[in-house]
Amino acid sequence: MASRKLRDQIVIATKFTTDYKGYDVGKGKSANFCGNHKRSLHVSVRDSLRKLQTDWIDILYVHWWDYMSSIEEVMDSLHILVQQGKVLYLGVSDTPAWVVSAANYYATSHGKTPFSIYQGKWNVLNRDFERDIIPMARHFGMALAPWDVMGGGRFQSKKAVEERKKKGEGLRTFFGTSEQTDMEVKISEALLKVAEEHGTESVTAIAIAYVRSKAKHVFPLVGGRKIEHLKQNIEALSIKLTPEQIKYLESIVPFDVGFPTNFIGDDPAVTKKPSFLTEMSAKISFED
């Protein structure tokens, strides 16, 4: 990047929080290089700028919430980096919605930089993200960068799985078995059915299109080791799922949004349907 002088054409996002020095200083000796505290942030950004050979980071994420640093310390420290021009935008990952909400309210009420993007686990099989994270992001105007959108590569059609086995390639896994679970098989079959309705066999493209159809400003984190993977990722950009297709995919694995949403309902500005409690008072309609 530096040698080709492409910095201004590239958006760089990186994170801090996870220990990145344990291998160097020794196990159990890297408390200064882990966590959300100011010291961890300082050394992490210092070293990231050096390694990336750049003067600034476009998006800096809090990687995960450690529950040991105060919201005030974290947001104050991050804002200093923005003021210094070392960071342009702030993101947060794998953190409870209540923490992000409190952090953004603190930042905006004190003239500091709030989080503008949230990164977390979300796919058609695991929809916990939809309980609090999406409504929170909608409220604050935050973008969403879901990871694990393709189920860690485990959303595969039966044909694709058999082809991988013939080549001696199993499904990638960090925990558990390399075989698909029953739920992964079912959702993969459903994704393939929808894919065929769009004239493709790409389960991956439909999995990506699903999250992009569910909310605004969704930028899925995608990967791949082959050119064909990249092509499937790009193919998703031209696919728009219908409400019926979304409903079908969501019928495969039941999802309970939980209390209080399953009691009072979702935001009528989104659903266009008022709470039954509201309708007890009068007939109210919500329009676009």
Curated annotation (Swiss-Prot):
Regions annotated as coiled coil: none
Pfam family, one: Aldo_ket_red
GO molecular function, one term: aryl-alcohol dehydrogenase (NADP+) activity
InterPro entries on file: AKR_Detox_Biosynth, NADP_OxRdtase_dom, NADP_OxRdtase_dom_sf
EC number(s) on file: 1.1.1.-
Keyword set, alphabetical order: Oxidoreductase
Keyword Ubl conjugation applies: no
GO annotation, biological process: aldehyde metabolic process
The family this protein is said to belong to: Belongs to the aldo/keto reductase family. Aldo/keto reductase 2 subfamily.
Alphabetized PANTHER family for the sequence: ARYL-ALCOHOL DEHYDROGENASE AAD10-RELATED, NADH-SPECIFIC METHYLGLYOXAL REDUCTASE-RELATED
Protein name: Putative aryl-alcohol dehydrogenase AAD10
Species in which this protein is naturally found: Saccharomyces cerevisiae (strain ATCC 204508 / S288c)
